[in-house]
Regions:
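Positively charged n-region of N-terminal signal peptides that target proteins for export
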Residues: 1-4
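N-terminal secretory targeting modules
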Residues: 8, 13, 18-173, 349-355
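Serine-esterase "nucleophile elbow" of acetyl-processing enzymes
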Residues: 71, 132-134, 139-215, 219-229
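A short helix->loop->beta-strand "cap" motif at the edges of active sites that frequently abuts
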Residues: 261-265
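Histidine-centered active-site loop/cap adjacent to the catalytic His
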Residues: 324-355
Length: 355
C-alpha cells in the first residue's frame, strides 16, 4: 500500500511538472550584462578576450549580477537549468552560488518572493520556485547564480498562463568591476550583493564584473572594460591587490580607460575594513598598507585626472559583527555597503545627467 501511494504521488508530481510551459530566460529580458556574449549567461566572451587565469576564466563565465525580468499571471513558477554547479565554498550558501533568487514588484518596491537551488545529485531537474500566488499579473526579477556557469535557464509557468518579457525599469548602464565583495561572496542568496541591492533600491542599473580574488587592475580586464558601453564606471579596485601593485597599476589603469571613455566618470571605492585585522598583526599590516596606498594615490588622482572620483564604503556595525569569515560581510554588511555609497555615488552620477 505504501509503495502504491508513493508511486501515485510521484506520478502526480510528474504530471504537475509536465503541465508547465517553459521559456528560455534569454528570450525574456536580461539586465545586468556588462557586454554582449555568444552565451547570454556569460559576462565576458573568453574566446574573444584572452589572458585570464583558469579561475578568472570561470568567474567571467558565471552570471553573477545578471537577472531576468518578466511578467506572468501564473500562480506558480518553476525553473530548469543546465550548467556547471560544482563550485563549493564554506563561506557562501548554495542558494547564492548555485541558486535562483526571485523578487516581485509590489507597490513600486522590489519585494523578496522566493529562492530555489538545484539538487546536488540531479541539478537538471525542475525546481519549484514559488507556488500558490494570488491571481493577477506579477512583475518578476529573477537573479541567476553567482558562481555557476549556465548553458540554459528555462522559466516555467502553468499551461495557459502568460509569460512575457518585461521592459526594464532600471535606468542607465553603470559598469562595476570589483573583487569578491562585488561578486557577492558570502551572501545567502544570488541577489544580495551590494551592486544588486543598490540597483533595486535606486533604479540605477549596475553591470557587475565582480571576480572573487581577481580584481587587480589587470591589463586584460582593462581590455574588456575598454569595449564596454557604459555611462559611468565604478571600481572596487583596492581589495585584492597589495600596496605595491596598487602603486604600479593605478595610474596606467586610469589613463587607459580615460583614453577610450573620455568624459565618463571613473569612481573608485576604498576597500572595507576586514575583521581579521582585529587580532592578526600580519593582516593588519598588509591591509593598512594597501588602504594607505590607495588613499595617498587617489588624493593625487582626483586632482590630476578629470572625471575621477574616490568614495569610501562602510559595512560597519558597532561591534564589527557583520563579517562571515573575517573578510566578507554577510547580507546585512552588504546592505550597509550599498546604502553607504548611495548618496555619494548618486551625487556624482547627477553631474553627468544620470538620474
Amino acid at each position: 500500500m505504501k509503495k502504491f501511494l508513493l508511486t501515485t504521488l510521484a506520478a502526480l508530481v510528474s504530471a504537475a511538472l509536465s503541465a508547465q510551459v517553459y521559456t528560455e530566460a534569454s528570450d525574456l529580458t536580461l539586465i545586468g550584462k556588462i557586454i554582449d556574449t555568444p552565451n547570454p549567461y556569460h559576462r565576458v566572451d573568453t574566446v574573444k578576450y584572452k589572458g585570464f587565469t583558469k579561475a578568472e576564466n570561470l568567474q567571467v563565465r558565471c552570471p553573477a549580477g545578471i537577472a531576468v525580468l518578466f511578467r506572468t499571471d501564473s500562480p506558480s513558477i518553476t525553473v530548469k537549468a543546465t550548467g556547471d554547479f560544482s563550485y563549493q565554498a564554506n563561506n557562501t550558501m548554495r542558494l547564492a552560488s548555485h541558486g535562483f533568487d526571485l523578487y516581485i514588484r509590489k507597490d513600486g518596491e522590489w519585494l523578496w518572493a522566493a529562492a530555489c537551488c538545484p539538487a546536488p545529485r540531479n541539478p537538471q531537474a525542475p525546481m519549484d520556485l514559488i507556488k500558490n500566488m494570488a491571481p493577477g499579473v506579477k512583475e518578476c526579477l529573477l537573479y541567476l547564480p553567482i558562481y555557476s556557469e549556465l548553458t540554459s535557464v528555462k522559466i516555467g509557468v502553468e499551461e495557459g498562463r502568460m509569460l512575457q518579457p518585461m521592459e526594464s525599469p532600471f535606468r542607465h548602464r553603470v559598469a562595476i568591476f570589483g573583487s569578491s565583495y562585488t561578486h557577492g561572496i558570502s551572501t545567502s542568496r544570488a541577489g544580495m550583493s551590494y551592486p544588486d541591492q543598490f540597483t533595486r533600491h535606486t533604479g540605477i542599473q549596475l553591470l557587475s564584473l565582480g571576480c572573487s580574488g581577481n580584481c587587480k587592475m589587470q591589463p586584460y580586464f582593462a581590455a574588456v572594460l575598454e569595449d564596454v558601453d557604459a555611462d559611468a564606471f565604478v571600481f572596487d579596485a583596492f581589495s585584492n591587490p597589495n600596496a605595491k601593485m596598487i602603486e604600479q597599476r593605478l595610474f596606467p589603469f586610469i589613463e587607459r580607460l580615460q583614453a577610450t571613455h573620455p568624459g565618463k566618470p571613473l569612481i573608485f571605492q576604498q576597500t572595507i575594513r576586514r575583521e581579521r585585522r582585529n587580532f592578526d598583526t600580519a593582516v593588519e599590516a598588509t591591509e593598512a598598507a594597501k588602504q594607505h596606498m590607495a588613499d595617498s594615490l587617489m588624493k593625487i588622482a582626483v586632482k590630476r585626472y578629470k572625471d575621477v572620483y574616490y568614495i569610501k564604503p562602510s559595512t560597519s556595525t558597532p561591534l564589527q559583527e557583520s563579517s562571515v569569515d573575517g573578510t566578507h560581510p554577510d547580507d546585512y554588511g552588504y546592505y550597509q555597503w550599498s546604502r553607504s555609497i548611495e548618496k555619494p555615488l548618486l551625487r556624482i552620477l547627477r553631474k553627468y545627467g544620470l538620474r
